[in-house]
UniProtKB/Swiss-Prot annotation:
GO terms for biological process: chloride transport; positive regulation of sprouting angiogenesis. The lineage of its organism: Eukaryota, Metazoa, Chordata, Craniata, Vertebrata. GO terms for molecular function: chloride channel activity; protein-disulfide reductase (glutathione) activity. Belongs to the chloride channel CLIC family. Coiled coil: none annotated. Keywords: Cell membrane, Chloride, Chloride channel, Cytoplasm, Disulfide bond, Extracellular matrix, Ion channel, Ion transport, Membrane, Nucleus, Oxidoreductase, Phosphoprotein, Secreted, Transmembrane, Transmembrane helix, Transport, Voltage-gated channel. This is Chloride intracellular channel protein 3. Residues 69-236 form the GST C-terminal domain. A motif (G-site) lies at residues 23-26.
Length: 237
């Protein structure tokens, strides 16, 4: 990347109109850029008001939006792929996971969570929660199973102690899953008094490890932002 290249990321603003708001896709790309270590400008956009800041180059587009030397990119997955391809070694770290399974671990959790938390029929709550719990348990099993490189170092290792999906390094897989997993834990704990269970110790360790990672902690919206976003969709119990 040329030294004069300009990178600008537009993300959803919080209720105060300035800090980072509730938008897992925005947090995902924000983390990618921080992990790459590339200079960029972050612009928070108040979506409740006229999007004057976007009208000249991305009218009608959904956030997040990347502006790369004047070139507009609006699809989150395509932006992520573009950044990984453009900002690669030796100048920037690769964030691609080593293991293909890391890319899909936990990918059904958010769908199960949405069905549970937005369910209008109380008698269906338990069945929907059990589906969410099974999805979380599958993630726990993946995080518990030693990866090949761990077994190469410790052939008799029975349980992984890694911090993240693919090892001890944050990857694109974590950038995708963790913002959503944090929402699941925050929203279920507040509205249903059902945080991710302590028995799923590897998932809890995973979340705790994320909160110790400055790139995740710094990009997280306040819990109040997340709860306010879900308040209209959650039926009281």
């Amino acid at each position: 990347m040329a030294e004069t290249t300009k990178l600008q990321l537009f993300v959803k603003a919080s209720e105060d109109g300035e800090s980072v708001g509730h938008c897992p896709s925005c947090q995902r790309l924000f983390m990618v850029l921080l992990l790459k270590g590339v200079p960029f400008t972050l612009t928070t956009v108040d979506t409740r008001r006229a999007l004057d800041v976007l009208k000249d180059f991305a009218p009608g587009s959904q956030l997040p939006i990347l502006l790369y030397d004047g070139d507009v990119k609006t699809d989150t997955l395509q932006i992520e792929e573009f950044l990984e391809e453009t900002l690669g070694p030796p100048d920037f770290p690769s964030l691609a996971p080593r293991y293909r399974e890391s890319n899909t671990a936990g990918n059904d959790i958010f769908h199960k969570f949405s069905a549970f938390i937005k369910n209008p029929v109380p008698t269906q709550d338990n069945a929907l929660y059990q589906q969410l719990l099974r999805a979380l348990t599958r993630l726990d099993s993946y995080l518990r199973a030693p990866l090949d490189h761990e077994l190469a170092q410790e052939p008799h290792l029975r349980e992984s102690h890694r911090r993240f999906l693919d090892g001890d390094q944050f990857t694109l897989a974590d950038c995708s899953l963790l913002p959503k997993l944090h929402i699941v834990d925050t929203v279920c704990a507040h509205f249903r008094q059902l945080p991710i269970p302590a028995e799923l110790s590897c998932v809890r360790r995973y979340l705790d490890s994320a909160l110790q990672k400055k790139e995740f902690k710094y990009t997280c919206p306040h819990s109040a932002e997340i709860l306010a976003a879900y308040q209209p969709a959650v039926h009281p119990r």
